[in-house]
Regions:
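Active-site loop immediately N-terminal to the catalytic Tyr-X3-Lys motif
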Residues: 4-12, 71
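Catalytic tyrosine of NAD(P)H-dependent dehydrogenase/reductases that use a Tyr as the general acid/base
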Residues: 14, 22, 94
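Active-site helix of classical SDR
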Residues: 17, 25
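Rossmann-like NAD(H)/NADP(H) cofactor-binding core
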Residues: 35, 40, 98
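Short, flexible catalytic-loop segment of classical short-chain dehydrogenase/reductase
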Residues: 43-54
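Catalytic Tyr-x(3-8)-Lys segment
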Residues: 58-78
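C-terminal substrate-recognition "lid" of short-chain dehydrogenase/reductases
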Residues: 75-102, 107
């Protein structure tokens, strides 16, 4: 089991929602590919948002930042390029059923 697949106390609903996105992304491929519809998703790591401002302590965010190989938390802007890439028929027309992780290497080790 990979570290990203393990839950943590107090995050069961959040973890379930991420698992849902992953599962439905892969399931819809079988249903929609015959209609030439591609299904992909972005799986962000720790992204600085109001969610983390409200539910994470500065100490926890700093500890997370130090564990990320790139030594920084992600931003919403970090997700823009991957979203454009996966949305483009020209750039990713033969890519479907993929979950693209945008996390600065957060779950490598």
């Amino acid at each position: 089991m990979c570290i990203r697949d393990r839950g943590s106390a107090g995050s069961s609903v959040y973890a379930a929602s991420k698992a849902f996105v992953s599962g439905i992304t892969r399931s819809l491929v079988s249903e929609l590919s015959p209609y030439n519809i591609r299904i992909n998703a972005i799986s962000p790591g720790t992204i600085t948002t109001k969610f983390h401002e409200q539910y994470s302590s500065p100490e926890k965010l700093e500890a997370t930042r130090l564990k990320i190989p790139m030594k920084r938390l992600g931003s919403a802007e970090d997700c823009v390029g991957p979203i454009i890439f996966l949305s483009s028929q020209t750039m990713s027309g033969y890519i479907t059923g993929q979950i693209l992780e945008v996390n600065g290497g957060q779950f490598i080790s």
